[in-house]
Amino acid sequence: MAKFELYAEVDVSISGHQYPVIICRNGLIDPELINRFITSKQVLIVTNRTVAPLYLGHLQSVLPSKQCDVVILEDGEEHKNQRSLSTIYDSLIQNKHHRDTSIIALGGGVIGDMAGFAASTYQRGVRFIQLPTTLLAQVDASVGGKTAINHPAGKNMIGSFYQPQAVIIDLNTLKTLPEREFRAGIAEMIKYALLVGGSFFERIQAVLQQGLTVHSPELPLLIAECCQVKAKIVEQDERESGVRALLNLGHTFAHALETYTDYKKWLHGEAVAIGLYCAAVLSEKKGLLDKPIVDQVEKMLIHAGLPHKIPNSIDLIQLRELMSLDKKIKNNCLRFVMIKKPGACYIDDSVTEDCLHNTLINVVEGEQK
């Protein structure tokens, strides 16, 4: 059996609950590691049709003494809904899982969100473990305890904050990740670079210029640093009443774009990439961000092979209406995460309709800035 190899461990401590984020290789097939976080005789693995043929058997093999039930869901953001959630509940109930059971999320952000939400609500809360298999889930979605399903009206409208027992990031799972999915995950890394600034921003810029791949030697520690940044923020503000909202940089635009296209045109990270560019242009329009930084953001997204413009087929008025469902809204006021410079972002509730409209027009494909 391949030997377990640890790269880094990030500790997250929220509301008296502490858990590790373990960045490693061969963790998925290490019985000692997995069973450290499984305290009961019952386990439900939630995965999807893409990941199951690749890794489900490996995970089951390290749980031979457990009642190990499995739910295999359809793959894709469009399946992050009440029907899929009910499938998880049905399996838990039909297989007589008790309150001491553990749910394992084996997959990307969609699986983690749904399995986590099921764990937070089944019998008022059971243990769960995140085994993220996409770069986006590893650097962002699996850490911090956000769980949710989508509603036809908008993304992540129904959810909870519920922390896992552990996040085990086995970097070997990235070897089977499609190139497009890998690039989508880079968008969240660029987001962290903009939030943190300094040397981290410069390093992300440099590795993207060189060409960041799954084989890049810098990747494990970059993932660990992203997890550290997120852990530090969510430890201060678990329920997004303050500083955690900064993690939504670019997401007001991204979620509206995803909802507009029924989650069928872009992966989440691709929509975030467009949203980051929109946020940079909006910040420039408000006189906050220098144009050379906007150009740097654009180049980073291009180097990452990500989209950054809104297609001219999108109805901007309808897109603006969808932004009205944004979860950062307070007192009926739409709030945006703005960029003064890399490392200096803040929440702004004073963006005028004219400024927003001009921004949207300027980020449409084929339009001149």
Curated annotation (Swiss-Prot):
Pathway: Metabolic intermediate biosynthesis; chorismate biosynthesis; chorismate from D-erythrose 4-phosphate and phosphoenolpyruvate: step 2/7. One of its GO terms (cellular component) is cytoplasm. Zn(2+) binds at residues 188, 251, 268. Disulfide bonds: none annotated. Pfam families: DHQ_synthase (PF01761), DHQS_C (PF24621). The keyword Kinase does not apply. Its main location: cytoplasm. HAMAP family: DHQ_synthase (MF_00110). InterPro entries: Dehydroquinate_synthase (IPR050071), DHQ_synth_AroB (IPR016037), DHQ_synth_fam (IPR030963), DHQS/DOIS_N (IPR030960), DHQS_C (IPR056179). NCBIfam families: aroB. Catalyzes the conversion of 3-deoxy-D-arabino-heptulosonate 7-phosphate (DAHP) to dehydroquinate (DHQ). Binds 1 divalent metal cation per subunit. Can use either Co(2+) or Zn(2+). Its cofactor is Co(2+); Zn(2+); NAD(+). This is 3-dehydroquinate synthase. Keywords: Amino-acid biosynthesis, Aromatic amino acid biosynthesis, Cobalt, Cytoplasm, Lyase, Metal-binding, NAD, Nucleotide-binding, Zinc. CDD domains: DHQS. It catalyses: 7-phospho-2-dehydro-3-deoxy-D-arabino-heptonate = 3-dehydroquinate + phosphate. Its EC number is 4.2.3.4. It is found in: Cytoplasm. GO terms for molecular function: 3-dehydroquinate synthase activity; metal ion binding; nucleotide binding. NAD(+) binds at residues 75-80, 109-113, 133-134, 146, 155, 173-176. It comes from the Bacteria. Belongs to the sugar phosphate cyclases superfamily. Dehydroquinate synthase family. GO terms for biological process: amino acid biosynthetic process; aromatic amino acid family biosynthetic process; chorismate biosynthetic process.
